[in-house]
């Protein structure tokens, strides 16, 4: 299964790495808290910045409004889940 990028203003190479972290997070972990922590930790290590990651089931009627600095937002879908990642 592939991660669909819904919105991102991050560079393409960064997006591709994040997509890989998302797939690995879902393969290695079960609970949403553990998945989001895995993705966040991998991004923190790789990019040397602090990120916040939110993972939710998209079938639960999730909605969100985020305001971030330019070049800091990634939002994608994997299976029936939505992943939102941004630099803080």
Residue spans of the language-model regions?
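Charged, amphipathic alpha-helical regulatory modules used
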Residues: 1-88
